Amino acid sequence: SENCSIEIRNSQITNTLNDCVAIFGGSAIIQQCTLAQFYPFDSNRGAALYYSNFQGERYMPLLKMDCLNSIVTGYANDVITGAKMDDETKEFNYRFVNSLLRTPEVTDDENIINVTFENVEDTSAVSGEENFVLVDIDKQRYDFHLNEKSPAINTATIEYSLPEDRDGRQRDELPDVGCYEYFKDPTNNENE
């Protein structure tokens, strides 16, 4: 998006050649989404999430980029790119809240709140096995529902939680990060 006001909720945006989501200025809310960059055909694939307050030489104030209760992951050790102009007076406002991120851990940023960072040394995280039901790079088959080991389970904040997941299933009292709520039996709407 360029200088737009957008809201992305309960969405899965995955495996694109370019950035899965790219925000150039404006206002954006990414709420309870799964952004996963496992695009297999080009090592120069984009980021899972790119946000900036400029494009080329043109300043585009980033009024807000809120990533809430979301998963942002992929093959690379860092699938999130925040690019800002050198001029500190230019607006560049972002927040990551109760999200699962594949990026180097940040400890001194007040805009990163209650976030879980994936271990970039863990090969199961790189392949998606840590989080998802199926990431089969050989056959190009993917299922981005959460598996039982995912650190995304029960880590969303109620404050920004949506009542239903992308499949239309009711989220429980301890909602999960990402667009899919984990259920032990995927055909059942109740956790066992």
What name fits each language-model region?
Residues 1-15, 186-192:
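Extracellular beta-sheet-rich ligand-binding/adhesion modules
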Residues 9-143:
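Predominantly extracellular beta-rich ligand-binding scaffolds that present long acidic/polar faces
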Residues 141-143, 147-192:
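Surface beta-loop-beta hairpin patches that serve as ligand-binding interfaces in beta-rich domains
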